[in-house]
């Protein structure tokens, strides 16, 4: 949808990257090392000083004793981290449980690993989606009652059923892209109990670990009893330090798993960029005040954007973490969310992602916006979205004429 946004000159709230700069200390360090390096390969699983700084940071936030030599592989973004982790623990013919909605790469990673995905619905507070779950052939067991549901939730029985069917691992995106769910400690314990019972693994995607809105708290499932041995934690520096283009990610896991991840990683990309690791090491050493400021900054952006949507009478998911909202466009008679997003970019001037990209179920009434933008960018987008209701009348007429 970035291409569509560029085509029509729309404000791009589709692809999840910020339009503000990384912390100056990081970019200053990059400028310092540009003349003299490092410019050649680092150790394939990550430069020593980078891994040491990362181990110290993550040990601080998780309370775990993470060894920089035994428990870390540095990857080219969390995308590679997830692929390497999947190929490490999953064999051809295995199955992998994935919550729906989901970041689209998870399905591809599963298939490329020779495994089969099993989808577990996260049920949001919309009756339209509840009905979609009920009639989806792939979600016959996921039917939900017609009562209102307070937040995204899951049926633990469906997780257990997935492992009964042979799931080797479960993918956990927490906080969740696209729905913004932050899993509670109790929910994570429920997942952990099932995974332990069936001798499985959890592969996490925790790239938004520091973007969580009060009163919610991020809990690392690897810290629960019995889960360090069964968790392959994937994350990156992209969102935390606003360096999505630097492609610096990592895997944290027990030594017996990391030894195998190293081998897979070596044949996927060899190693992450040495000068970028050197520069980013500065960020890994930031004090707690940086992460508190980051959370405050994102809370401000969330309030600015969501308050604007509320003023227009629009219905959307209220994120607990990450930086996405899913807008309910069912009142405009939307049957094809891709077509609607193309229309939105052309006629309203704001880019969004069709919600159906993230769902296994038959869901076409949601579109995803992200709000990791400067105030002036968000305000300009809101100014354009203020005309959505009036302009949508032409869209509705178009849809009627198509019928």
Predicted regions, residues:
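Conserved N-terminal alpha-helix of the aminotransferase class I/II PLP-enzyme fold
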Residues: 41-76
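PLP-dependent class I/II
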Residues: 1, 5-9, 15-33, 64-403
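A ubiquitous short alpha-helical element
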Residues: 39-42, 263-264
